[in-house]
Structures are given as structure tokens and as C-alpha cells.
Amino acid sequence: MTKQRQKIALVCTKGGHFTEMTNLSDFYSCYDHFWITNKNEQTESQLREDKAYYINMAHFKQPWTYLSQIVPVLKAFFVEKPTHIISTGSGRTALIPYLFARLTNIRFMHIDTFSRVQGYSKFGNFLLKMGNQIYTQWKDSANSKAIYIGPI
């Protein structure tokens, strides 16, 4: 039996969520990885050396905007074949990768944003309602479904 190599999809929106993800570089740089994020000056300049798939940012109040993400996310999954997905949010970029992960039995790990001091983000709440565990950066937010990992 051959052992499957580990490949990580790093999924996040531009800005603070992207910065939080780059803070994990000591971890993910040890693995084959690629990005699914939004295109802007920050992401383009910092991902010159990495494989990146850029998708449009959707909005919960306009659910049809998620449709534009389906093809690029499918392409990324088909080409890259991730074994794990790590997301720092937000759901505006991570929802479609999460749904595909559920359909294909890919492990999805969400680290809720540090800026959410009380409670969880909308996407974090959605994941909890779907029966998923999330990782929180605040000790006060920890419980059986939200595991405290400390600030990243």
C-alpha cells in the first residue's frame, strides 16, 4: 500500500485573514501547498514564489456571487489534489472550498479570526452548526467544538 503525499490548500481572503495565514508559514512551508485567495497587491507580491488560484470575493447577502468561485475552485482541486484544507476565513472565500471538501472527504480545518474577540465569525458559526470543529485564538471562546490554539 502506497502512502499518499500530503498537500495543503491554504484558503483565505485578502487582508487580515491572509496575514494570519502567512503567520503559519513555519508550519505549511514543510508541506506541498497552494493558495486559494483573492487577488490584490498584497497577495500578488507575497505569493510570487507560490502556486495561487485567485477567486472573486463573494458575499453572504448576495449568494449568487458564490457561483463565480465554483470553476476556479474546481480547477484548483482537480489540478492540485489537496489532502487537507486550512482556512483562516472568511466565508466569502472559504465557503465553496469547504463545500467541495465535504463532498470529496478532504479534511477541512478552520482557524477563526483573531479579531473576533467574543463569539465566532459568521463562517465559524456556520461550520459549528454543520457539526464541524473549529480552532479559536481566544481561550474564552473554547468549548468542545472550538479548540483553543492561541494567537497566530
Predicted regions and their residues:
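N-terminal subdomain of nucleotide-sugar transferases
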Residues: M1-N38, Q42
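An amphipathic, basic-hydrophobic alpha-helix
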Residues: K61-H84, L103
